[in-house]
Structure formats: structure tokens, C-alpha cells
């Protein structure tokens, strides 16, 4: 009868050790401060064209669609022609 409280204490200790290990792993993970994250976003948006922000990049030329991905359309058309099946699963 005296062994049951010992097993319960052992289980509690094991759970606490697992929690400590999880917390140590989380603490060891690389962190980024909010200011560095903001600078990273600003750097990305200032070097990659995004016509959704016309104040920075201006408007696209008339008749030009900068988001039109013709390469993807051509690959899809080619892959669709090569298959003889009725369906294509991507």
C-alpha cells in the first residue's frame, strides 16, 4: 500500500521534468524582437514591387497585369495535354 504514493510522486516528477524540457527547448529557440521584425518587413516591402501599394510603386501600366503568371498557365496547359485521363489531381 505504501508503494502507490511513491508511484504517484514519480509520475508527477516525470511530468514536471517533461514540462521543464519543453520550456528549455522553447527558451533556446531563436527569437526576434518586434523592432527587428518591423525592420525586416519594411526592408522586404521596399525591395519587392507590390502594386497593391501604389503610393510606393505607382500603378501598373495600362493593359499590364503584374500578377498574371503565364509560366504557371503554360505548365498547366502542357501537363493537361499530356495526360489522357479525365482528371488531374494536384
Curated annotation (Swiss-Prot):
Keyword Chaperone set for record: no
Main localization (coarse): membrane
Family: Belongs to the G protein gamma family.
Annotated source species: Kluyveromyces lactis (strain ATCC 8585 / CBS 2359 / DSM 70799 / NBRC 1267 / NRRL Y-1140 / WM37) (Yeast)
Lipidation (S-farnesyl cysteine): 87
GO biological process: G protein-coupled receptor signaling pathway; pheromone-dependent signal transduction involved in conjugation with cellular fusion
Protein name: Guanine nucleotide-binding protein subunit gamma
Location(s) in or outside the cell: Membrane
Gene3D superfamilies recorded: Transducin (heterotrimeric G protein), gamma chain (4.10.260.10)
Tagged with keyword Membrane: yes
S-palmitoyl cysteine: lipidated positions: 86
GO cellular component terms given for this protein: heterotrimeric G-protein complex
Quaternary organization: G proteins are composed of 3 units, alpha, beta and gamma.
Keywords per UniProt: Lipoprotein, Membrane, Methylation, Palmitate, Prenylation, Transducer
Positions where Cysteine methyl ester occurs in the chain: 87
Amino acid at each position: 500500500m505504501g508503494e502507490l504514493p511513491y508511484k504517484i510522486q514519480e509520475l508527477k516528477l516525470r511530468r514536471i521534468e517533461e514540462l521543464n524540457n519543453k520550456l528549455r527547448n522553447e527558451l533556446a529557440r531563436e527569437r526576434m524582437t518586434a523592432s527587428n521584425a518591423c525592420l525586416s518587413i519594411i526592408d522586404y516591402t521596399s525591395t519587392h514591387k507590390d502594386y497593391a501599394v501604389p503610393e510606393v510603386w505607382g500603378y501598373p501600366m495600362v493593359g499590364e497585369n503584374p500578377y498574371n503568371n503565364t509560366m504557371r498557365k503554360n505548365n498547366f496547359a502542357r501537363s493537361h495535354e499530356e495526360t489522357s485521363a479525365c482528371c488531374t489531381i494536384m
